[in-house]
């Protein structure tokens, strides 16, 4: 039986209209190409978010936008972390400063609102200090758009299902590896996992990857899919209970950014510099200091 196509970029207009009529929900997956150990594809974050969103839309309805692989890194605490966990290896990053990523997100919200979606689920597989900032931006935008908004950042797994009680293993640990293995098996190769401490820290690899489990990952992905389904249903109910608003223009978004969001930037977690940063000879030093702009 052929799969129902839910990927926006692969659908023709009548398919999009039919999917919209069935369930006017849109998934917006975000991520980053960055080090995730020598055993995982560098696009892990967006791959997980996109593939899991596709599963949710296939099972319960909705449309999935193309994954956005440009995300926040290098500045402030991100740069300090990368100096310690990646070092001078070529990182293969697709990084943006935080203000550019967050402003782009505002335009993504405007676009799906203009199309008439009732709910938008923003799923960022890439986490960091911005996990505190994205909800603040969405709270501002929510006051100006009809589409109801929900965001999830990180693995999105509501519980660790590993039976040994050791947890998910942190960044690029067994939790992320297990989830990626479940949805994109060609993007995980455990034979590449280092067997000793030579050249540590192993391209930012996390803990317990030797106990990664694809079958367990499928159970965990099912958890996430059902969570997304429940949130989507709540968004539709919230939309139906409100009066619609006028669609925003590009100029409207610029005004909202300049008057409501930009003044908040100095307080955003992703804009903080709370340490002395990488040493002067580190490749991570150049963008560590956060400029006063945006």
Label every PLM stretch briefly.
Residues 1-121, 125-294:
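Extended, histidine- and acidic-residue-enriched regions that form the cofactor-binding/catalytic faces
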